[in-house]
Amino acid sequence: MAKEKYDRSKPHVNIGTIGHVDHGKTTLTAAITTVLARRLPSAVNQPKDYASIDAAPEERERGITINTAHVEYETEKRHYAHIDAPGHADYVKNMITGAAQMDGAILVVASTDGPMPQTREHILLSRQVGVKHLIVFMNKIDLVDDEELLELVEMEIRDLLSEYDFPGDDLPVIQGSALKALEGDSKYEDIIMELMNTVDEYIPEPERDTEKPLLLPVEDVFSITGRGTVASGRIDRGTVRVNDEIEIVGIKEETQKAVVTGVEMFRKQLDEGLAGDNVGVLLRGVQRDEIERGQVIAKPGSINPHTKFKGEVYILTKEEGGRHTPFFNNYRPQFYFRTTDVTGSIELPAGTEMVMPGDNVTIDVELIHPIAVEQGTTFSIREGGRTVGSGMVTEIEA
């Protein structure tokens, strides 16, 4: 059977389910796909049962093993890619490595338990890695007879969200039962449809990569006699056109300006290169030795070189190929940003003596030379060429 063409007529949004273990994330994911398949049948809306989502295949993202289930479905307004990770460690890795780029998430809290330690941790991680829009699904309300108890649980969740700078008083809270909806109870199916309408309305459509300011990590540099210097790489975001003014950022203290005089892909001239394209960019006013791998070509003023930042990192276990021993304050590994390694020193949070393989921790990093970074930039931590950790910049310090 011929593969169906991907329908681009509907806006595409990435979401996921987050929350404490056994609060019903996977059951809710199954319920969403199943109820949508019943109510809005389409080629995309196929029911997925708990077992098929729970048996998520292992993926390797930057050397880290992560189990993640990817399902897709559509509402009348949008197409969704939805991620659900079975284990708590999978969530942490997913979010810190940026493997799971979520535009918004559904926080699942069992009404029988209320917020639990991982509820808190997932809210904090969402805040750290820039998932700005959360919707709460209070699950298992069929098991709670007391209306007042539900109100208390909702207040507790809202307070917890406010504590981490989410709009706790204002964000949507939907109460339902994923299991009852999955079993076909129409009252609870209606609630799943209400949840999806809320997701449609409350989670904004993400800015497309092509609409963001240009960022092109330089992978290779060569000169063409008589024409000038060419820098090549894959456009991370934005677009590049002939005659654009750009900046070359990173490695050196000074940011350098240049003008694009040509854009090529597969040896063909282009009017413009778009996010995702592998291009060569011909630059006027730049010598071959003034630009190098590890720098980025960017829209002027959009990104700056920095040496100090806070990061949220996950340290690989021995089984994942990571370190066998903990590390301590002032550990000096390499930080791999986009196309290059830079040595940096790590300062641990007050009260943290050491970091064990398998831990996640907030660290302060100081690099030996500046790199173009911003909040949300991901990196690997390497030792002698092997990955020992993965992280994301959460705050720029200098």
UniProtKB/Swiss-Prot annotation:
Catalysed reactions listed for this entry: GTP + H2O = GDP + phosphate + H(+)
Q: What is its EC number?
A: 3.6.5.3
Residue ranges for the region (G2) are: 63-67
- Residue ranges for the region (G5) are 177-179
Please give the residue ranges the record annotates as the region G1.
Answer: 19-26
Annotated segments matching region G4: 139-142
State the UniProt keywords alphabetically: Cytoplasm, Elongation factor, GTP-binding, Hydrolase, Magnesium, Metal-binding, Nucleotide-binding, Protein biosynthesis
- Coiled-coil stretches are none
Q: Where does Mg(2+) bind?
A: 26
Pfam families xrefs: GTP_EFTU (PF00009), GTP_EFTU_D2 (PF03144), GTP_EFTU_D3 (PF03143)
Domain tr-type G: start-end pairs: 10-207
Q: Which domain of life is it from?
A: Bacteria
- Main EC class the enzyme belongs to: hydrolase
G3: where is this region?
A: 84-87
What S-S linkages are listed for this chain?
none
Report the principal subcellular site.
cytoplasm
Write out the GO MF terms.
GTP binding; GTPase activity; translation elongation factor activity
The record's subcellular locations are: Cytoplasm
Give the record's GO CC terms.
Answer: cytosol
Give me the residues that bind GTP, please: 19-26, 84-88, 139-142
Which protein family is named in the record?
A: Belongs to the TRAFAC class translation factor GTPase superfamily. Classic translation factor GTPase family. EF-Tu/EF-1A subfamily.
Oligomeric state and interaction partners are given as: Monomer.
Explain the purpose of this protein.
GTP hydrolase that promotes the GTP-dependent binding of aminoacyl-tRNA to the A-site of ribosomes during protein biosynthesis.
Q: What is this protein called?
A: Elongation factor Tu
The opening ranks of the lineage are: Bacteria, Bacillati, Bacillota, Bacilli, Lactobacillales
